Swiss-Prot record:
The modification N-acetylmethionine is found at M1. Pfam families: Actin. Component of the chromatin remodeling INO80 complex; specifically part of a complex module associated with the DBINO domain of INO80. Exists as monomers and dimers, but the dimer is most probably the biologically relevant form required for stable interactions with histones that exploits the twofold symmetry of the nucleosome core. Its main location: nucleus. Plays an important role in the functional organization of mitotic chromosomes. Exhibits low basal ATPase activity, and unable to polymerize. Proposed core component of the chromatin remodeling INO80 complex which is involved in transcriptional regulation, DNA replication and probably DNA repair. Required for the recruitment of INO80 (and probably the INO80 complex) to sites of DNA damage Strongly prefer nucleosomes and H3-H4 tetramers over H2A-H2B dimers, suggesting it may act as a nucleosome recognition module within the complex. GO terms for cellular component: centrosome; Ino80 complex; nucleoplasm. Residues 1-25 have a biased composition (Basic and acidic residues). This is Actin-related protein 8. Residues 1-29, 430-462 are annotated as: Disordered. Keywords: Acetylation, ATP-binding, Cell cycle, Cell division, Chromosome, DNA damage, DNA recombination, DNA repair, Mitosis, Nucleotide-binding, Nucleus, Phosphoprotein, Transcription, Transcription regulation.
Length: 624
């Protein structure tokens, strides 16, 4: 046989082998064929879409993009029948604002804010002279708008073609007289499940699928039929609902048709985006604020807490303070989308945390509502610009009554599709383990728990008891049957812990106290020292002038004295690498897409189809 014939025979064998592999079901590469090896890495990142869904804004883009696309996370759906009542999810309004105690709570919160402003001296060593609303009210009430133009330049979204739905900016600018319902599918970081129209889990997931698919097609220019070539990185909250995450993963893989997915927590992605290995991550969003300590890519479960307030609450508080000062735009309504956008803009423009800016100052703003003249208002403000953002540290000022304001990490409700969840592990524990656990619970609950007052005065065992999560009541009742009289005490201990946690979650912690609580929940003093030394602030809710210095001052003053002596500097980072703090977590998701270790985290469509939620337990980079 000649050399050429030998070569042909070998080529034939290779082709035959490839055919055999295909028949045996070896996975084909996700990247389209005929790609030179040198471009493989680049193409892989280019074929990964990073999605960071927020309560108000959706951020998404390819992993290779410098910045993500930001889209209002809202959808307008056309009425199916004529005469259907209009429905719209609230933006700045929320439950618990119109209770009899709300106004008294607001006033008490404002007194604490004023006391804090007066107690901190300005940089020249003098105290601020407070400005009362009466000093501005008479001036502001005299002000009348000047007409800049008879046409504002803005228009309502054209709905003459009667589209079934509108997404993002188009949904925000739907005329209120048109027959469309407005839905925000995520509220306070969780799926917006409610008893009203469009509030079922199925309806919310359908809204999310439409918004994300529309954004991918319009802004990333990826046809939906090509998503089988793409993979997705999804950012989820630190305190997540397992059922909701499972449904989102199912939607992305099985309905939208992505080839694979990696799910990771926002706080860990924020550390990737900022280039920090260990830090206390403070994510102040529009609707919620989450705090947790991250060390070497791991979010410590017992340090996580979520506060049910954010930037939109500051906007609403600023409106209340401006009303006290005679706000000249008297037609402003919190139920009007255009006015909500205006109030958000005024907060971002005028509010600050700079003690040195004091006294009365003149300001002006424009109103450019669709199909209305452009108006110019002039008005005068004093301390209101500082008081509103300080409500984040004194949340009683928001006037929210009877709502759960703080969420800790709890044991999940269990999932019948997940055979190795915590409920299964509890049920299969030996009697000795259960008895030992009951005794430990009894001992821990016998100690007094003080939730009132400043957190720095509390004993160090508080975090340990809070982070141990709620013990499953059914398993405790099982202990009662096995352990006799001892188990009655254990059940009492369990109930007292549940009551303590319930009391704690009913209180609205200020941002500084939440950070101190989170750090105090770390397991060792070395870790606590690391966290006090590095506090990373992300999200758009604390983007105020001098916020960095203000937060640093409050943490230093309230830190336990034992740490104040040994920590040289509390480093509060509000703009890592000079990046917009709202984009840090998304950027971290893009970094995650490029890491070699991420290859082990992908969950593929076929695997999900076969094994379901068990793949999250196997592949997630955090404890599922």
């Amino acid at each position: 046989m000649t050399q050429a014939e030998k070569g042909d025979a070998e080529n034939g064998k290779e082709k035959g082998g490839e055919k055999e592999k295909e028949q045996r079901g070896v996975k084909r590469p996700i990247v389209p064929a005929l790609v030179p090896e040198s471009l493989q890495e680049q193409i892989q990142s280019n074929f990964i879409v990073v999605i960071h869904p927020g309560s108000t804004t959706l951020r998404l883009g390819r992993a290779t993009d410098t910045l993500p696309v930001s889209v209002p996370h809202v959808i307008a759906r056309r009425h199916k029948q004529q005469g259907q009542p209009l429905y719209k999810d609230n933006w700045l309004l929320r439950e618990g604002l119109n209770k009899p105690e709300s106004n008294e709570q607001r006033q008490n919160g404002l007194k604490m804010v004023d006391q804090a402003i007066w107690s901190k001296k300005m940089s020249n060593g003098t105290r601020r002279i407070p400005v009362s609303p009466e000093q501005t009210r008479s001036y502001n009430k005299q002000m009348r708008p000047a007409i800049l133009d008879h046409c504002s330049g803005n228009k309502w979204t054209n709905t003459s073609q009667q589209p079934e739905y509108l997404v993002g900016e188009e949904a925000l600018y739907v005329n209120p007289l048109d027959c469309y319902n407005i839905h925000w599918p995520i509220r306070r970081g969780q799926l917006n499940i409610h008893p009203g129209p469009g509030g079922s889990l199925t309806a919310v997931l359908a809204d999310i699928e439409v918004i994300w698919s529309h954004a991918i097609q319009k802004y990333l220019e990826i046809p939906l039929k090509d998503l089988k070539y793409y993979r997705c990185i999804l950012l989820i909250p630190d305190i997540y609902n397992k059922q909701h995450v499972k449904e989102l993963v199912h939607m992305i893989l099985m309905k939208m048709g992505f080839a694979g997915i990696v799910v990771h927590q926002e706080s860990v992605c924020a550390t990737f985006g900022s280039g920090l290995s260990s830090t206390c991550v403070v994510d102040v969003g529009d609707q919620k604020t989450s705090v947790c300590c991250v060390e070497d890519g791991v979010s410590h479960r017992n340090t996580r807490l979520c506060l049910a307030y954010g930037g939109s609450d500051v906007s609403r508080c600023f409106y209340w303070l401006m009303q006290r000062a005679g706000f000249p735009y008297r037609e402003c309504q919190l139920t009007n989308k255009m006015d909500c956008l205006l109030l958000q803009h005024l907060k971002e423009t005028f509010c600050h945390l700079d003690q040195d800016i004091s006294g009365l100052q003149d300001h002006e703003f424009q109103i450019r509502h669709p199909d209305s003249p452009a108006l110019l208002y002039q008005f005068r403000l004093g301390d209101e610009k500082l008081q509103a953002p300080m409500a984040l540290f004194y949340p009683a000022t928001f006037g929210i009554v009877g709502q759960k304001m703080t969420t800790l990490q709890h044991r999940s409700q269990g999932d019948p599709e997940d055979p190795h969840d915590e409920h299964y592990l509890l049920a299969t524990q030996s009697k000795q383990e259960q008895s030992a656990k009951a005794t430990a619970d009894r001992k821990s609950a016998s100690k007094p728990i003080g939730f009132e007052g400043d957190l720095r005065g509390q004993s160090s065992d508080l975090p340990e008891r809070l982070h141990s999560q709620e013990v499953d009541l059914a398993s405790s009742q099982g202990d009662c049957l096995m352990a006799g009289n001892e188990s009655e005490e254990a059940l009492t201990a369990l109930m007292s812990r549940k009551t303590a946690i319930s009391l704690f979650e009913g209180k609205a912690l200020g941002l500084d106290k939440a950070i101190l609580h989170s750090v105090d929940c770390c397991s060792s003093d070395d870790t606590k020292k690391k966290m006090y030394s590095s506090i990373l602030v992300v999200g758009g809710g604390l983007m105020f002038h001098k916020a960095q210095e203000f937060l640093q001052h409050r943490i230093l003053n309230k830190m336990p004295p034992s740490f104040r002596r040994i920590i040289e500097n509390v480093d509060v980072i509000t703009r890592p690498k000079d990046m917009d703090p709202r984009l840090i977590a998304w950027k971290g998701g893009a970094v995650l897409a490029c890491l070699d270790t991420t290859q082990e985290l992908w969950i593929y469509q076929r695997e999900w189809q076969r094994f379901g939620v068990r793949m999250l337990r196997e592949r997630a980079a955090f404890v599922w």
